[in-house]
Amino acid sequence: MDTIKRMLWPKKEIFVGTFATGVERDTSVDIFQLVCRVVLRYMRTGKIENNTDSLGNFIVELLKTDCAAKWEWFMKRRRVGDYAKSLAIASIPVIPLLSYATMKKTVALRAFGNELSFNIRVPRPSVPKKGLLLRLAAGLALAPICALAMYATLPREKLSVFKLRTEARAHMEDEREATDCLVVEPARELKGKDGEDLLTGSRMTKVIASTGRPRRRPYAAKIAQVARAKVGYLKNTPENRLIYQRVMIEIMDKDCVRYVDRDVILPLAIGCCFVYPDGVEESAALWGSDESLGVKXGGLVRLPGVVTQTNRDIPSGVLLPQEVLEVRAGPPNAKDRNIFMVAGCPSQARFLVHNHCLKNLKRGLVERVFCVERNGQLTRTPQPTKGAFGRLSPFRKAVCEKVGVAHRLGYDGFLSYYSGAKLRTYTRAVESLHITPVSERDSHLTTFVKAEKISTAKGDPAPRVIQPRNPRYNVELGRYLRHMESKLMKAVDGVFGETTCIKGYTADEVGQIFRDKWDRFNKPVAIGLDASRFDQHCSVEALQFEHGFYRAMYPGNKLLSKLLDWQLHNKGKGYVPDGTITYRKEGCRMSGDINTSLGNYLLMCAMIYGYMRHLGINEYSLANCGDDCVLIVERRNLKQIQGTLPEYFLNLGYTMKVEPPVFQLEEVEFCQAHPVQFQGGWKMVRNVRTAMSKDVHCVNNIRDLATRRAWSNAQHHGGVALTSGIPVVEKFYSRFTLYEVPKKHQRIDTVTNVHKWRGSGGDYVVTPEARASFWAAFGLTGDEQLALEDRLDRWEMDLFGEEGVDAHEPSILDSAVA
């Protein structure tokens, strides 16, 4: 109705300049889509099957399908009663041609010797000559209308069902197979237990086959062809049989094959997967021959640091009046960093490191502290709406009630949490605090460029910066928070009713946590939440909300309030060999703060808790690792979350991206790791492409022999502990040579990055189930896993020879480098 009104009485729009300002424009009506919807609704197709670009082609294609469906109904299912309405409509054009005169007819009835007679009028059709042309014209005018009406009333099944049957014939052995095996149920709407709308039938295919009937073998051959097309030709090994089995179960789930039939079809289909056409086995033997994989010994390669080629200034109007960024260039005295790589590893991914220079430091501060990029332009980070964090106060209240009132640690108690270099640093800070109390100057930031492995596949990313405060400040704040971190994590778990904060667990424990979370749901789906530069988006309001947790544990503590307020108004300096940078920033999480990890946990959990309460969804499970989150829900809630989550977080000042959902446990990615089943249960395994490319690079200076030995030992011990019983990656870490540890050696964590989760140890073997689960997680088939392991067996490290050049031969991992 609104469309008709707009066509009859169009609104007059006022245009100012090139664009209309302050004028509400109505969306244009797509006549093509409107006609398609009207026609398809009348034709009862059940869905809009619009695959063409022109209206003429669309109508022609629709009529062809409609005619074929009606002809099939007439040839196979015709009944007299189905066509009564159509025949009645077809006789309407004949009615104007006839003239109906009446004649008297006497009817006599006799009963008990008496006779009763009466006259009745009987119509007598005839074709009179008078007015014949006029009657003929009326009949001809009605003929096309009645023909269309008669065609429209001809019986047929739904076009969506007919199309499904037609497609099925292309994949079955013959038409009888498609007709007998495929039964499409009519659509019916149901209500779920939670009141949600469910649609059953309509597009659902069921395979109906009785025991002993010959339809199972052709169907088994067909799904075997589909499985080989998806996975490829694999050798007949236990792990590859499991891989084929998983693919075919997914196909039969989609086809709704009865479980009694799967018991017979599955062994037949798995056997068909290993029946190869002529020439396939010979080609596979040539592909996997040892002569085609000539691997050289792995020597140490030194790669120089890089300087960003991008130089961007902060646009005017972005900085607040109290914010400043001053750059002072000095003499060109910048020194190059180095990154060391072990050559010969079967991965083409390469990593570099940013130099500690003025150009890198400036870009890191501009793009990772002050500005975000939106539509190719630098702008200020989004700010939360007024009162947005106030709506999250029920979560904070629930957590603080579980924690209760805390007591501040003494200096010795705080120092007991540290060892090594950090212990020495904080010990000197404590000695200084005994002489001079903490002051606002201790909260000032010292900024430098992070020595991080940067993938060459990312182009020229903005360098990351580290912004620690004075150790004196960290000691005073740590006395309030360091011992309460685990208690706050447990309190958050208590509010959610399950393990939510994934911190302090082994890789095996985290894998089992995900297994338990997944089993809670009937039809689970996992959604990854990617917070773009979470630390940078922490506004003053977000930090104040976080500080409310700490203030509630220490009510009325003035020193704590003063320490926390200094985090809201940041002052920092960055010293590099070729210049200095001085800046002031309101809000923003500083990466060197002692409460960075704890604060990110609390903020993310609070926002997810408030969001799910906002939607009214009670069945969900959250795995949180700071700014990296995975949300597991029932599939019926997926669309609701995908459509509303980014806007909700934007109102809180965060740019949140909803990653594509996954429907298998192994496909869940959490902190660049996937759950993988192995002999001991479930384990979180780092992405194989990331692990085998990053862990052959080292950003520390390992030029001296003792440090090289310590680094190799750390890679071997740490990697094997994390990957015992896992295909490929266990073999990879075992190739790092073990050396005798000298009496005075560097600690492991000083020469290599600390692993995300500790290893639980244990001596496990690689099982077929582990290979199948590894394939589901990373897409490497059993044959590809064995080929990689064979290549790693022939990879020999030489960390003490002369520095070589980067040499690489193609491998399976190069197809999708992370």
From Swiss-Prot:
It holds the Pfam family Tombus_P33. One of its GO terms (molecular function) is RNA binding. Its EC number is 2.7.7.48. It catalyses: RNA(n) + a ribonucleoside 5'-triphosphate = RNA(n+1) + diphosphate. It is an enzyme of class 2 (transferase). Belongs to the tombusviridae RNA polymerase family. RNA-dependent RNA polymerase that plays an essential role in the virus replication. This is RNA-directed RNA polymerase. It comes from Cucumber necrosis virus. The lineage of its organism: Viruses, Riboviria, Orthornavirae, Kitrinoviricota, Tolucaviricetes.
